[in-house]
């Protein structure tokens, strides 16, 4: 027996659906159109999505396994606060999978994306496919991922490969960040090749030009295991990067450093060697500051932190527990959370010390022969 339906009208969550066709036994053969489909109630278990969608296509398969193939579109969608416009593409949907084909959308002033792929609708909700990006807005995309950047803009070009599942996605990004700008400073083009797979974050390439210098990183960090990452800076002008912090920090200088991060990701060990030249802090000039330090068990151990101005040097060494940096209360001598530092000034110009001390103690410019050991309190 064949059931013929003409001018079918239905509604759900404020959306209107129209169709016509036949059903022979359990076999479906309908042309359907959906208008003003508000996505929030349909996708609330997957993402924070707001906006209206239209869908037009063919409904086939059976009543046990209906299949929709057609085209979808939206003038404007908002996903996790990021606005996407001119959403257009093809889609295949059955009870087990949703698969987008050539799903294009615009983002920002000139960003264009095309998605090929989708997600299984049963079991672990597996992700598959890839997306290409052309001039994607960096700030909007980091907001989409829940990451907030301060005073930083750029255009992402490249490809993102998707895998894993909805709760534990695999994401691989390879491309460039063009016109990377921090504050008012155009840094240039950054090379990026990073991946997140089974909660293991891998940095194959990360290079950021900073003036005449370069900031780079490589390695991996298992979110449930160990870390092995190297970060390096060569001739980096600090004044070009500090706007990222979102704070006014009166610090300038050319920085070189190598940092090795290893051990447990949740409690890593850090080995740092750094050198800064032509540094100023609050108008105080220092020829050179260099340091060797480690961090282990959440305690920074300074082997040496030396500030040099002309023929004079000041030295700091000792321990800084991370807890001391996050408290505003008084820590008595002997408290394991308190800083324990030695400040060695031997015939020195003490004006270099504000640049070296962790709580930026302001000292007048003078000379002193002495060795001081004291507990520095936040």
Language-model features: locations:
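Interface amphipathic segments
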Residues: 1-260, 266-365, 373-378
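Acidic, contiguous internal or C-terminal segments within carbohydrate-active enzymes
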Residues: 370
């Amino acid at each position: 027996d064949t059931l013929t339906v003409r001018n079918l009208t239905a509604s759900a969550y404020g959306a209107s659906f129209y169709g016509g066709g036949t059903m022979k036994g359990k076999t479906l053969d309908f042309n359907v159109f959906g208008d003003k489909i508000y996505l929030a109630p349909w996708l609330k278990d997957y993402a924070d999505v707001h906006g209206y969608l239209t869908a037009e296509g063919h409904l086939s398969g059976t009543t046990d396994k209906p299949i929709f193939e057609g085209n979808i579109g939206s003038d404007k969608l908002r996903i996790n606060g990021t606005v996407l416009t001119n959403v257009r593409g093809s889609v295949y949907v059955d009870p087990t999978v949703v698969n987008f084909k050539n799903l294009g959308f615009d983002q920002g002033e000139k960003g264009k994306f095309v998605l090929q792929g989708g997600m299984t609708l049963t079991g672990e909700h597996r992700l598959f496919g890839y997306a290409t990006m052309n001039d994607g807005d960096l700030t909007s995309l980091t907001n989409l991922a829940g990451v907030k950047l301060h005073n930083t803009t750029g255009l992402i070009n490249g490809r993102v490969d998707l895998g894993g599942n909805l709760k534990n996605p695999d994401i691989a990004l390879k491309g460039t960040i063009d016109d990377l700008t921090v504050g008012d400073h155009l840094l240039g083009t950054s090379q990026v090749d990073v991946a997140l797979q089974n909660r293991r974050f891998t940095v194959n390439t990360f290079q950021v030009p900073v003036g005449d210098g370069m900031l780079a990183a490589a390695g991996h960090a298992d979110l449930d295991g160990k870390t092995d990452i190297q970060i390096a800076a060569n001739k980096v002008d600090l004044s070009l990067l500090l706007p990222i912090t979102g704070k006014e920090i009166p610090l300038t200088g050319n920085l070189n450093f190598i940092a090795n991060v290893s051990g447990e990701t949740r409690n890593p060990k850090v080995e740092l060697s750094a050198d800064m030249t032509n540094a100023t802090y609050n108008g105080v000039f220092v020829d050179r500051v260099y340091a060797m330090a480690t961090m282990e068990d959440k305690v920074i151990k300074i082997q040496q932190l030396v500030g040099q101005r002309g023929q004079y040097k000041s030295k700091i060494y000792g321990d800084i527990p991370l807890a001391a940096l996050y408290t505003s209360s008084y820590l008595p001598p002997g408290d394991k959370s308190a800083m324990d530092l030695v400040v060695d000034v031997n015939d020195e110009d003490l004006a270099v010390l504000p640049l070296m001390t962790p709580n930026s103690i302001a000292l007048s410019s003078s000379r002193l022969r002495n060795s001081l050991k004291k507990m520095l309190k936040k």
